[in-house]
């Protein structure tokens, strides 16, 4: 399901992530080229973020991507449109 697609994953406690779905087994999801969606603006929900992207990229807080991450508490996986993927990837890297 959605393997090799760019997706948004919501974890029960770990948060929200966007990346390329490498594998899924139960509640464990492995993403590559992954960004944590620490704070978003310009989309009403992560569903809207997956469909249209952000209308306010300058307000979003997405740290730098990591090569690979294993999310052990995935409760939602939403495939992204090409426009949404481009929008998420275009957000400037946020650092503290």
Language model features with spans:
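Conserved RNA-binding domains used in RNP assembly and mRNA/RNA metabolism
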Residues: 1-96
């Amino acid at each position: 399901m959605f393997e090799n697609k760019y997706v948004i994953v919501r974890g029960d406690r770990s948060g929200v992530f966007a990346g390329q779905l490498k594998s899924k087994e139960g509640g464990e999801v492995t993403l590559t080229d992954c960004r944590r969606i620490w704070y978003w603006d310009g989309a009403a929900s992560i569903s809207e973020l997956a469909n249209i992207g952000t209308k306010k990229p300058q307000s979003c807080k997405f740290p730098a991507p990591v090569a690979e991450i294993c999310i052990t508490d995935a409760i939602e996986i939403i495939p992204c449109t090409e426009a949404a993927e481009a929008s998420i990837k275009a957000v400037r890297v946020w650092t503290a």
